[in-house]
């Protein structure tokens, strides 16, 4: 099944830069775009209200917020415990302390169930392997494994689309600009781990990654846009 044959999709939507960019793109490609947001008691839970506001502003087909607070009880992380400071250093296992084990496994499973009930042919998620935070559940191999599990477990054709998988952060900004939504993504999304909308706190790892990508794009617009066109045309990692 190809994305071209799909008319109805579910977007895993946090209200951050990546998922909002995916949502904006989806609105140009599909007849029905349904957003699903997860409340797991996250440190930056302001993102839920941001997602609600953006869903209304962008006039998506529907928006559902799901309570998954059980994840907060099971997964100890800087994103689920205010008492654990967000660190720029990796833990002993080589992962950031903001990694929430099982988060995307749970999110994609629930999004798959929702897609099944809606009759949607695809889930869209903004995970990325090229310029990312080091989370293992953002990798291409993980997504393909989850897609296979959902298809087999529900006996339904279902695709997981990852528009940003092989894009770096500068190219992700370029993608928002391509749809004339750079200002909306810059000023009205929430990526910051400390819950500050727009440019954020400027200190956490998420803000650093976002800022570096924006600066790169603004300083090299033509070059980055050309590289975006090449990356989206091939759908493969760029050398």
UniProtKB/Swiss-Prot annotation:
Cofactor note (record): Binds 1 zinc ion per subunit.
SUPFAM superfamilies: Adenine nucleotide alpha hydrolases-like
Descriptive protein name: 7-cyano-7-deazaguanine synthase
One GO-annotated biological process of the protein: queuosine biosynthetic process
InterPro entries referenced in this protein's UniProt entry, alphabetically: QueC, Rossmann-like_a/b/a_fold
Encoding gene per record: queC
Residues where ATP binds: 13-23
Pfam families: QueC (PF06508)
The family this protein is said to belong to: Belongs to the QueC family.
EC number: 6.3.4.20
Binding positions (Zn(2+)): 192, 201, 204, 207
Catalytic reaction equation(s): 7-carboxy-7-deazaguanine + NH4(+) + ATP = 7-cyano-7-deazaguanine + ADP + phosphate + H2O + H(+)
Enzymatic class: ligase
Keyword vocabulary terms for this entry: ATP-binding, Ligase, Metal-binding, Nucleotide-binding, Queuosine biosynthesis, Zinc
Species, as recorded: Shewanella sp. (strain ANA-3)
Main function: Catalyzes the ATP-dependent conversion of 7-carboxy-7-deazaguanine (CDG) to 7-cyano-7-deazaguanine (preQ(0)).
GO MF terms, alphabetically ordered: ATP binding; ligase activity, forming carbon-nitrogen bonds; zinc ion binding
Cofactor: Zn(2+)
CDD domains for this protein: QueC-like (cd01995)
Pathway(s) this gene product operates in, as recorded in its UniProt entry: Purine metabolism; 7-cyano-7-deazaguanine biosynthesis
């Amino acid at each position: 099944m190809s994305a071209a044959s799909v008319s109805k999709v579910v977007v895993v939507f946090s209200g951050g830069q990546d998922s909002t960019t995916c949502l904006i793109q989806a609105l140009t490609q599909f007849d029905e775009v349904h957003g699903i947001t997860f409340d797991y008691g996250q440190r930056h839970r302001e993102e839920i209200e941001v997602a609600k506001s953006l869903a209304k502003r962008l006039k998506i087909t529907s928006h559902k917020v799901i309570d998954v607070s059980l994840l907060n009880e099971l997964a100890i992380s800087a994103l689920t415990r205010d008492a654990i400071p967000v660190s720029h250093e990796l833990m002993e296992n080589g992962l950031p302390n903001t990694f929430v084990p099982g988060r995307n496994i749970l999110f994609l499973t629930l999004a798959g169930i929702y897609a099944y009930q809606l009759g949607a042919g695809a889930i869209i998620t903004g995970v990325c392997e090229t310029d990312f935070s080091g989370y293992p559940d953002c990798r291409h191999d993980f997504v393909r494994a989850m897609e296979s599990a959902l298809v087999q477990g529900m006996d339904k054709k279902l695709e997981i689309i990852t528009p940003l998988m092989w894009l770096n952060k500068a190219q992700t900004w370029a993608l928002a600009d391509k749809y004339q939504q750079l200002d909306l993504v810059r000023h009205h999304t929430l990526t910051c781990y400390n819950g500050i909308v727009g440019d954020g706190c400027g200190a956490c790892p998420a803000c650093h990654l976002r800022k570096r990508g924006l600066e790169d794009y603004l300083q090299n617009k033509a070059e980055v846009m050309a590289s975006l066109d090449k990356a989206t045309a091939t759908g493969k990692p760029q050398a």
